[in-house]
């Protein structure tokens, strides 16, 4: 059985590798997504990656998913982390758990995520390897459930 995970790349992720490289690193969004796909393949997981700078588009995308096809979701809310959007409520209403991932540690910069309370867990501070860490943890937690 194929295990599917949806990955949401939030606002300003398309600026990765261009802006604030000292915080977020030199990898572009395309490079980050390629790494996610490589890590997923190594775990025998299928990923669907979606990016938008518009919170309403993210909500519309999530509401349009066939929720029976996914075991989990991963979100790097990026610019949506501290914004008041419908994303947290939409995530909370999903039939599968979501996990928040950040390559850096937002708390180190005093950032408090408005998305995290709707998530089952989080992975912060491992660079873009955090997506693979999250996918591995999702699979392990399903084995022990």
Question: Residue spans of the language-model regions?
Answer:
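Extreme N-terminal starter segment of soluble prokaryotic enzymes
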Residues: 1-5
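Short beta->alpha junction loops
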Residues: 48-57
């Amino acid at each position: 059985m194929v295990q599917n995970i949806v990955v949401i790349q939030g606002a300003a992720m398309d600026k990765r590798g261009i802006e604030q490289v000292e915080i977020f690193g030199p990898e572009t969004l395309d490079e980050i997504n390629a790494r996610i796909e490589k890590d997923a393949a190594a775990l025998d997981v299928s990923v669907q990656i979606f990016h938008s700078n518009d919170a309403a588009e993210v909500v519309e995308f999530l509401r349009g998913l066939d929720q029976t096809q996914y075991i989990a979701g991963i979100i790097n809310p990026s610019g949506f982390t501290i914004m008041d959007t419908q994303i947290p409520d939409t995530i909370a209403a999903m039939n599968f758990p979501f996990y928040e991932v950040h390559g850096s540690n937002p708390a180190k910069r005093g950032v408090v995520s408005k998305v995290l309370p709707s998530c089952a867990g989080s992975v912060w501070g491992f660079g873009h390897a955090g997506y693979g860490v999250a996918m591995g943890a999702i699979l392990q937690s399903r084995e022990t459930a």
